């Protein structure tokens, strides 16, 4: 069954389907909505089926391999494969994108272009997580750039052009470094370019060149993850983008940076990774505390959630640099956990804005009684974000803590220092999240409910939140269901 081109199908199906959107009837938005939702759902069900029935979880190597000559003169191939590391992120992409399409139901301004861009992004994201060729990885990385820019600039808030320009400026610079590093790696020491990950892993470089290449790739990932000081595009982008776009940004786009760091930097440049790891651990710790502290001063609901995402990504960086399987496993778990939680919080923030027409926390208050379902869902995911036991965030952060504690790569004093400041970041998290809940749902009746018509969450919104909340609880209660996916794959990294 592995000989069947399953991966090509789940990558190209949404892309080809996107080009049929202009042919759909223009009078009714319902047609393009259901068409796009059906495409995403079918693709998600197909990937779930093939991974559930045909993936060998005891095999640590890549499966469903495909390799087709594309540009023979430079050795470029359409090379795909899936292992435990990429499978979880592919399934996350399918789930979040499908629900983001459903979340975009209220979009009425040029819906054909909106859903076209979402399907193009969907293909690019799956393509990136399945790429086994470095040039193909680069192409899929770049495929995200224009759709995200258009989604922000055309369907965003009042400062959407500023946010979109800032986003493309940061990511374009990161892409330039990625482009230079990619071609340097592939052409170094060979007359014919070597693009396949397995072949590149066998190359050796002078230490100074390895460090330069590590930083070149790392800069691109640092923008996407993001890592301070390359993070300032994120609050502006989340603050202005439509909440369905925010779901894709928080749920999937940020994870591309973490995935690239593990798949390329750790694997291809192990000596440079060991050299920079202590500094990255310190940077990740500073990021946790800094972003959590800035959260407390944010009066804009979406910007507060954006800074909380930056803080949580600091844990991912620490786990990647822990040099332990449990720490690295925790980093991957944190990426998936945050993908679910972050997407949910931005969706809830957006649907709240649809009702009260403000994201200013100082203008909110006392809406719990009129919107009890919204209040319950916001509370549940806020508790998940602060890593409450029985939820996925707790499992991920605990594994990262254990990974850095048990790491023999670092001295005991360094580990104690990092754990101490990580704990401080963990303490700050409930402060800004519970404060957010208090400002939104408790306190004075700001909106004079007797003269306003409030509508609580409807079936569509409840379905989206429940679909994201169920895996958060399952991972929190039975983490081995998720961890077993990549356990064997991590043993060979």
Swiss-Prot record:
Keywords attached to this Swiss-Prot or TrEMBL record, sorted alphabetically, are:
Chloroplast, Membrane, NAD, NADP, Plastid, Plastoquinone, Quinone, Thylakoid, Translocase, Transmembrane, Transmembrane helix
Q: Give TM regions.
A: 4-24, 34-54, 87-107, 111-131, 134-154, 167-187, 212-232, 242-262, 276-296, 313-333, 334-354, 385-405, 417-437, 462-482
Q: Which InterPro entries match?
A: NADH_Q_OxRdtase_chain4 (IPR022997), NADH_Q_OxRdtase_chainM/4 (IPR010227), NADH_UbQ_OxRdtase (IPR003918), ND/Mrp_TM (IPR001750)
Specify whether Lipid biosynthesis is a keyword of the entry.
no
Location, primary (coarse class): plastid
Membrane-related topology note: Multi-pass membrane protein
A Pfam family in this protein? Answer: Proton_antipo_M
Q: Does the keyword Isomerase apply?
A: no
Localization recorded for this chain is: Plastid, Chloroplast thylakoid membrane
- GO term, biological process aspect, one: electron transport coupled proton transport
Query: Which reaction is catalysed here?
Result: a plastoquinone + NADH + (n+1) H(+)(in) = a plastoquinol + NAD(+) + n H(+)(out); a plastoquinone + NADPH + (n+1) H(+)(in) = a plastoquinol + NADP(+) + n H(+)(out)
- Gene Ontology terms, cellular component aspect? chloroplast thylakoid membrane
- Listed EC numbers: 7.1.1.-
**GO terms of molecular function:** NADH dehydrogenase (ubiquinone) activity; ubiquinone binding
Main enzyme class: translocase
Q: Which family does it belong to?
A: Belongs to the complex I subunit 4 family.
What's the protein called, per UniProt? Answer: NAD(P)H-quinone oxidoreductase chain 4, chloroplastic
From the broadest rank down, the organism's phylogenetic lineage runs:
Eukaryota, Viridiplantae, Streptophyta, Charophyceae, Charales
């Amino acid at each position: 069954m592995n000989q069947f081109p399953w991966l090509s199908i789940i990558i190209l199906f949404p892309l080809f389907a996107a080009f049929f959107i202009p042919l759909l009837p223009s009078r009714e938005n319902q047609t393009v909505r259901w068409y796009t939702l059906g495409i995403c759902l079918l693709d998600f069900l197909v990937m779930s089926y093939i991974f559930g029935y045909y993936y060998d979880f005891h095999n640590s190597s890549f499966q469903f391999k495909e390799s087709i000559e594309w540009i023979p003169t430079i050795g470029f191939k359409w090379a795909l494969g899936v292992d435990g590391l990429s499978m979880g992120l592919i399934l996350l992409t399918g789930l979040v994108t499908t629900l983001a399409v459903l979340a975009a139901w209220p979009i009425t301004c040029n819906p054909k272009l909106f859903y076209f861009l979402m399907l193009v992004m969907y293909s690019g994201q799956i393509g990136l997580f399945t790429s086994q060729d470095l040039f193909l990885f680069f192409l899929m990385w770049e495929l995200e750039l224009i759709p995200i820019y258009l989604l922000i600039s055309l369907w965003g808030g009042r400062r959407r052009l500023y946010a979109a320009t800032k986003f493309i400026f940061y990511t374009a610079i990161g892409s330039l470094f990625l482009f230079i590093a990619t071609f340097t790696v592939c052409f170094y020491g060979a007359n014919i370019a070597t693009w396949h990950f397995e072949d590149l892993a066998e190359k050796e470089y002078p230490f100074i060149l390895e460090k330069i290449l590590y930083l070149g790739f790392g800069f691109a990932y640092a923008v996407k993850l993001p890592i301070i000081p390359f993070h300032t595009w994120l609050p502006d982008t989340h603050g202005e983008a439509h909440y369905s776009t925010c779901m894709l940004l928080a749920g999937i786009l940020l994870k591309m940076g973490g995935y690239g760091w593990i798949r390329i930097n750790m694997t291809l440049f192990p000596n440079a990774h060991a050299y920079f790891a202590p500094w990255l651990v310190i940077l990740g710790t500073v990021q946790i505390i800094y972003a959590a502290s800035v959260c407390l001063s944010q009066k804009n609901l979406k910007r507060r959630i954006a800074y909380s995402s930056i803080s949580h990504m600091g844990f991912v960086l620490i786990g990647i640099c822990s040099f332990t399987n449990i720490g690295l496993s925790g980093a991957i778990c944190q990426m998936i956990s945050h993908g679910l939680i972050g997407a949910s919080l931005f969706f809830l923030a957006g649907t709240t804005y649809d009702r009260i027409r403000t994201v200013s926390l100082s203008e909110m208050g006392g809406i719990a009684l009129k919107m009890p379902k919204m209040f319950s869902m916001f509370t549940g995911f806020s508790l998940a974000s602060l890593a409450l036991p029985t939820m996925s965030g707790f499992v991920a952060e605990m594994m990262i803590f254990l990974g850095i504690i048990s790491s023999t790569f670092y001295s005991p004093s360094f580990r104690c220092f990092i754990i101490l400041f990580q704990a401080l970041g963990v303490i700050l998290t409930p402060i800004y999240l519970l404060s957010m809940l208090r400002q939104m749902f408790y306190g004075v009746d700001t909106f004079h409910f007797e003269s306003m018509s409030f509508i609580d969450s409807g079936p569509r919104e409840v379905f989206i939140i429940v679909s994201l909340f169920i895996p958060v609880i399952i991972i929190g209660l039975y983490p081995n269901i998720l961890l077993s996916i990549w356990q064997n794959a991590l043993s060979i990294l």
